[in-house]
């Protein structure tokens, strides 16, 4: 809520919660007087945060953005990774121009799971999971790495023609936010969102 004030004290891997100058104990019924957090003492000075009512969002370039939410009592706090319906993707390593992509399903529809295979190049890595494949009008959210030449995903937009997609006409994108490329280092609320 907007009437209660807390002091959150971050130290190496822990967050202590004070209300009206009193340390809150037995956080989440754990017997601990702290909430475990992933940030080391050195990383604490690098976190950026924003807060709205009972929700605090924390960013650090080495971690998935975290959401800390106060529950129904002064000692009920949860921390979770932020989940995003949409996030940026980017083609970091365009090494498949000489390849040809083919779809394992004939005419897959929006929502279908399909497998895409590349011949003539081996561009697929585990870093592509969560990214996008685009070509011949179709868009697939990559959900699984199968091999260096194959991945599976969910069709978001149907292909005009999925028989053969030239590497030059395709885009194989990784999530822009990842352990390999880093995570957002800044955060804010805009219009209460």
Where would I find each of the regions flagged by the language model?
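Short beta-strand elements that form the blades of beta-propeller/WD-repeat-like
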Residues: 4-10, 54-59, 193
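Hydrophobic residues embedded in beta-strands of well-ordered beta-sheets
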Residues: 7, 15, 56, 65, ...
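Hydrophobic/aromatic beta-strand positions that recur at structurally equivalent sites within the blades
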Residues: 18-20, 68-71
């Amino acid at each position: 809520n907007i009437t209660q004030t807390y002091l959150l004290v971050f130290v190496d891997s822990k967050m202590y919660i004070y209300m009206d100058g009193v340390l809150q104990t037995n956080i989440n019924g754990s017997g601990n007087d702290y909430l475990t957090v992933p940030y080391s003492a050195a990383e604490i000075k690098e976190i950026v945060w924003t807060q709205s009512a009972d929700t605090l969002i924390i960013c650090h370039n080495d971690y998935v953005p975290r959401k800390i939410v106060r529950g129904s009592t002064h000692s009920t706090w949860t921390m979770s990774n932020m989940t995003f319906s949409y996030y940026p993707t980017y083609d970091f390593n365009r090494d498949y121009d000489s390849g040809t992509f083919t779809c394992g399903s004939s005419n897959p529809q929006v929502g279908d799971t399909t497998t895409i295979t590349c011949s003539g190049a081996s561009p697929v890595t585990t870093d592509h999971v969560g990214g996008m494949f685009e070509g011949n009008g179709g868009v697939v959210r990559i959900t699984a790495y199968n091999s260096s030449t194959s991945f599976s995903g969910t069709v978001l937009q149907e292909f005009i023609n999925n028989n053969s997609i030239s590497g030059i006409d395709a885009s194989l994108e990784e999530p822009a936010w990842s352990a390999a490329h880093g995570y957002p280092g800044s955060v804010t609320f805009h219009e209460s969102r």
